[in-house]
């Protein structure tokens, strides 16, 4: 799944359309992770979209599965995790 924080942030997003605050990016990711988890879909990996495909906003690819089968489940991330991706 592609998470585009600029669409998850809502009215907090400035006129530039760029999500610059790591806390806002973290909330966007956690909102999607929480929604998926509540519906029995589990995140097992998160990474950023490579720079050459990025249009100024940092976007995230998340691997979701219905049955984790012993894989580590990611239920939430913190802003330090997001900054270091």
Specify the residue positions occupied by each region the protein language model found.
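S-adenosylmethionine
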Residues: 1-54
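A short, glycine/Asx- and small/polar-enriched loop/turn
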Residues: 54-60
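Flexible, glycine-/basic-rich loop-and-beta segments that form/coincide
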Residues: 58, 65-85
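Preference for bulky hydrophobic residues occupying beta-strand positions
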Residues: 1, 62-64
């Amino acid at each position: 799944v592609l998470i585009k924080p600029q669409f998850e942030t809502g009215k907090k997003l400035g006129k530039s359309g760029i999500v610059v605050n790591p806390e806002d990016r973290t909330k966007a990711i956690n909102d999607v992770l929480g929604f998926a988890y509540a519906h029995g879909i589990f995140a097992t990996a998160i990474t950023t979209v490579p720079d050459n495909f990025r249009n100024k906003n940092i976007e995230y690819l998340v691997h979701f599965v219905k049955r984790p089968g012993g894989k580590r489940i990611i239920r939430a991330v913190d802003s330090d995790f997001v900054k270091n991706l």
